[in-house]
C-alpha cells in the first residue's frame, strides 16, 4: 500500500477519506518531495527554452564568437539572413481563374 494514497470508505451513504498516520514524518517528506517535483516540472515545461539556453550558453545570448575575425562573423550573419530570406520563397501563390 502506498504512503501517498488516501483510503476511501463508505460512511453513512457518502464517500469520505480516512487518512491514517498523516503525521508520519515519512508521509510528510514524501508529500513535500511530490509537491516540489510537480512545481519544478511545471516550471520546466513553461520555461524550457530559456532554461536550457541558459545552461548551454551561460549568461551570454548565444554561441561565442571570440577569436573569430569580424569579416567571418559578418559573412556568417549574411548567410544566416539569406537562408531566412530564401525560406520565404517556399510558399507558392496559387491563383484560381
UniProtKB/Swiss-Prot annotation:
Belongs to the influenza viruses matrix protein M2 family. The M2 protein from most influenza A strains is inhibited by amantadine and rimantadine, resulting in viral uncoating incapacity. Emergence of amantadine-resistant variants is usually rapid. The record marks 41 as: Seems to be involved in pH gating. GO terms for molecular function: monoatomic ion channel activity; proton transmembrane transporter activity. It comes from the Viruses. Glycans are attached at residue 20. It is found in: Virion membrane; Host apical cell membrane. Its main location: virion. It comes from Influenza A virus (strain A/Russia:St.Petersburg/8/2006 H1N1). This is Matrix protein 2. Residues 1-22 are virion surface. InterPro entries: Flu_M2. Forms a proton-selective ion channel that is necessary for the efficient release of the viral genome during virus entry. After attaching to the cell surface, the virion enters the cell by endocytosis. Acidification of the endosome triggers M2 ion channel activity. The record marks 37 as: Essential for channel activity, possibly by being protonated during channel activation, and by forming the channel gate and the selective filter.
Amino acid at each position: 500500500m502506498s504512503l501517498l494514497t488516501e483510503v476511501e470508505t463508505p460512511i453513512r451513504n457518502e464517500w469520505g477519506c480516512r487518512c491514517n498516520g498523516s503525521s508520519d514524518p515519512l508521509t510528510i517528506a514524501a508529500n513535500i518531495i511530490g509537491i516540489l517535483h510537480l512545481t519544478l516540472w511545471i516550471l520546466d515545461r513553461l520555461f524550457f527554452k530559456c532554461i536550457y539556453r541558459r545552461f548551454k550558453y551561460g549568461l551570454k545570448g548565444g554561441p561565442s564568437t571570440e577569436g573569430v575575425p569580424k569579416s567571418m562573423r559578418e559573412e556568417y550573419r549574411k548567410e544566416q539572413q539569406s537562408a531566412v530570406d530564401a525560406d520565404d520563397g517556399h510558399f507558392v501563390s496559387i491563383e484560381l481563374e
